[in-house]
Amino acid sequence: MSLGAKIAVSAMRGIKKTGLIKGLSADLDAELRKAKKYNRKHPYARLCESQNRGVKAVKILIFGAGVIGSLYGALLAEAGYNVSVYARGRRLESLTQDGLLYKRKGKIRRASVNILSRLEAKDCYDLILLTVRENQLHAALEELRQNVSPTIVTMVNSLETYDRWEAICGVGRIIPAFPGAGGGFDGNVLDAALTPRLIQPTTFGKTGGRERALARVLHQAKIPCQIVPDMRAWQLCHLAMVVPIADAYYEAADPEHAGRDTALMRKTAKQIRDNLEAIAARKIRLSPGKMQAFRLLTTPLVGWILGFVFQSSFGDRFMYRHSMKAPDEMLRLHEQFYRWLEKKAI
């Protein structure tokens, strides 16, 4: 076994013994075996070692400097992590000139991050948060194929299977996730926030133990998160809800005030319910469990609730802004989701 693999195994055994990251047990043992098998330092060991040295030792790359990437980058930098942001085009120009500006508690702050215009194959990060739109995902994964960083957290709304992504960037690198955040830009200043913990924390799936190391990073930055047993099921249920919500904005005569249209809200409620019923009929467990409410409550009641949410500041920040900013992405997701339902019905 090479020196690198021996160091990885030794470090991970020490972490298990001291309880640095709780609850690893069988998952950690499996990772140790992988480190031996592949005769190299395992990505899980690398992240754990960096965490053991302190937050400044953990290198994080934000790949995609839109609303989501900028917010996570700012919050992680606030927590002391070594954060770099990879951007292009006008966003790169803005970041290079002014830095990553964001609103926080009524004040404008500048995040302590490194701004990158290119990513070299040898540039190694403990975590890469991939925060691009669904229709940009494949190109981003292609670019990351040659990079040596071991772990890519895909914070993307998509219906594709994760093995398809790993076929592009490399097996064992993906942690499938979804952000719990929303907002927009006021000029070049980020005006965004995390979604409330009870509604939708940052969510990611189980990946043999690495997800717990990721959770520790987010907890350190006070970013609420949850680990779900079946991320694929979670994303299907999420699409079952957000696709009809986006459709409602596009169908409304006055999208900004779509929540005032009672008939449209009831139609949206019925479509969400039908979508979740179709998923459940395919023996897929609804995730999170609160999705069951759409099936149990009456359509008029759910429609009334949706109308209230659409007209709230929450709806404006976390629903309206994204739907109106990314209609091409939402149309693609609409087509993918209903094509999947039709295919599964055959």
Kindly give the residue locations of the regions a language model identified:
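Charged/polar low-complexity intrinsically disordered segments
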Residues: 6, 16-17, 34-36, 51
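NAD(P)+-binding Rossmann beta1-loop-alpha1 motif at the extreme N-terminus of oxidoreductases
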Residues: 56-108
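Rossmann-fold dinucleotide-binding core
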Residues: 163-238, 244
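NAD(P)-dependent Rossmann-like dehydrogenase/reductase catalytic/cofactor-binding core
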Residues: 277-346
